[in-house]
Amino acid sequence: MSSPSFINKLALPNLATITQYPALTVGLSVFTFLLLVIDLCSNQALSQKFSLYPNAPFEFDLNRLSFYLLFHRGFTHWLLNVVGLFSPLAIFERTNGTVFTGVTLNVLAVTAGLQFCIVGKLLYPNTQVIGLSGVVFSFMSFMAYKEHHTTPVIYTFKYQGSEVSIPTLYSPFIFLIVCMVLIPGSSFWGHLAGISSGYLLALGYIKFLYPPSKAILFIERKLQTPINALRSLVVYYKEEEAIEQRGVSYNPLLSSDPESALNDIPVTTGARTNSFAGEGQVLGAT
């Protein structure tokens, strides 16, 4: 059973130490907020242009598959998604590198979006979705799969004299049901597609969608000057160091001390990045 302190660490970033957080995690939060402000000022013209609907890929409107996750219907929608995604994304980025994590976000958005559209052709042809919540569920299922090997049960409680256990592997479906009950207007099918994509990511079934590491290294070399300029603001995790860590055995979060699991991850200082916390062979809404 995970402790309350672990849950708090996952859910709430400490704004007082924001310069110690990964570049993409911070940048995505700021960028999506700016897009929200611009979208609201333009009477939601941007979100209408990039919202995902079931027929979009069949009409070759492919930009929607990548960009629908960047827009939100309002401040509350944005805040819930950013709070839910911030810490899981930071953990992933610290282990896998900044650019690689950006590619992962796009891969998850596209795979979840395609599933949503294929099912939607039959069940909800006129529904449109936007937002990061599908990716939140993707990282939830990704981590659930990784964690269940060492922590098969995430929570145990008593009900009418019987002990009930919640398997770690299937815990995302509990959150799916809770979200559906508490937020009736949320996209059940979009969240379900996000869960599916997270499992596919953890199992390595969508690794063919990733560019070779040489391409990422080439991009980083070309952007070395602006990357160095970011070091005083956020932590940039380079592909060169991340490559060495993807083969390291997974370091479970639930079975370790919650404080050290999230705090003992080195940060970048000066001109180089210190060693990563290993997360194993990893890859890489609504």
UniProtKB/Swiss-Prot annotation:
InterPro entries: Peptidase_S54_rhomboid_dom, Rhomboid-like_sf. It is found in: Golgi apparatus membrane; Golgi apparatus, cis-Golgi network membrane. It is a multi-pass membrane protein. One of its GO terms (molecular function) is serine-type endopeptidase activity. One of its GO terms (biological process) is proteolysis. Disulfide bonds: none annotated. Signal peptide: none annotated. One of its GO terms (cellular component) is Golgi membrane. Keywords: Golgi apparatus, Hydrolase, Membrane, Protease, Serine protease, Transmembrane, Transmembrane helix. Its main location: Golgi. Its EC number is 3.4.21.105. It catalyses: Cleaves type-1 transmembrane domains using a catalytic dyad composed of serine and histidine that are contributed by different transmembrane domains. It comes from the Eukaryota. It is an enzyme of class 3 (hydrolase). The chain crosses the membrane at residues 18-38, 66-86, 99-119, 122-142, 164-183, 188-210. The active site is at S133, H191. Probable rhomboid-type serine protease that catalyzes intramembrane proteolysis. Belongs to the peptidase S54 family. This is Rhomboid-type serine protease 2. The lineage of its organism: Eukaryota, Fungi, Dikarya, Ascomycota, Saccharomycotina.
